[in-house]
A protein has these predicted regions:
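Short intrinsically disordered terminal tails
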Residues: 1, 52-54
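A short beta-strand micro-motif
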Residues: 1-9
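Short linear/disordered segments characteristic of secreted peptide precursors
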Residues: 11-12, 46
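Short, mixed charged/polar active-site loops
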Residues: 12-14, 36
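Structured surface patches comprising rigid loops and adjacent beta-strands/short helices at the edges
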Residues: 18-20, 39-52
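Core beta-strand residues in small-molecule sensory/regulatory alpha/beta domains
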Residues: 29-30
Length: 54
C-alpha cells in the first residue's frame, strides 16, 4: 500500500506505508513499526492510503 501526501503548493510524496495518523498537529505515516514521514498538518491539503502507485 502507498501513502500519498499532497501539499498546499501542489507537490506530493508517494511512499510505501500501511497506516496514517494525526497527532500533535502532525500527519504521521507508518510502514509497519517504522515512522516513514512526519509533516505539519498546516502544510497538507490531502493525505490518504492507496493500493496502487500514483
Amino acid at each position: 500500500m502507498r501513502a500519498i501526501i499532497k501539499f498546499k503548493d501542489n507537490s506530493y510524496i508517494n511512499i510505501s506505508a500501511d497506516y496514517i495518523a494525526t497527532q500533535d498537529d502532525f500527519v504521521k505515516v507508518w510502514n509497519g513499526e517504522n515512522l516513514v514521514a512526519m509533516v505539519r498538518q498546516e502544510e497538507v491539503s490531502a493525505c490518504y492510503l492507496s493500493e496502487r502507485r500514483e
